[in-house]
Amino acid sequence: MSRVAKAPVNIPAGVQVSLNGQLLTVKGKNSELSRTIHNSVEVKEDNGALTFAPREGFAGADAQAGTARALVNAMVIGVTEGFTKKLQLVGVGYRAQVKGNSISLNLGFSHPVEHTLPAGITAECPSQTEIVLKGADKQLIGQVAADIRAYRKPEPYKGKGVRYADEVVRTKEAKKK
């Protein structure tokens, strides 16, 4: 069994977990998340904790058990605390503005780019060059952040573009004469 799957997922107070076949639903004060667990993984709830074990006769069941445990742990953290992802806009005239359920980005194109946020994700702009994404679903936040970054990735010579707040952009030296 994988080392990750051996550790149980503790369920904090105020979080309800329901298991219906292979469909696991986690409800918390912030939101509710559901996920279908792979058939090769057996999930048990006892004493306020979820345990994951591989089923016999499935190839790769050990790996699936570890993956399922990590995904469910992220769900529990998401419904209790939530996740945040910060983006920075680097470049002259690069700006972001939140308009209801979408973000308007000025990224040097001839037109502003409108990015509609999916349900469950909120955005705020503490300054014109910063975007903070918040939500309960870790995978969805990462996907939205990657989609926004893909509009204008950091270029390697000046570092202009949309980058994650903790990202270090390696810059190249300019061509010498």
Swiss-Prot record:
A Pfam family it matches: Ribosomal_L6
Gene3D superfamilies xrefs: Ribosomal protein L6, alpha-beta domain (3.90.930.12)
Example GO BP: cytoplasmic translation
Keywords: Ribonucleoprotein, Ribosomal protein, RNA-binding, rRNA-binding
Gene Ontology terms, MF aspect: rRNA binding; structural constituent of ribosome
Subunit architecture: Part of the 50S ribosomal subunit.
Similarity-based family: Belongs to the universal ribosomal protein uL6 family.
Protein name in UniProt: Large ribosomal subunit protein uL6
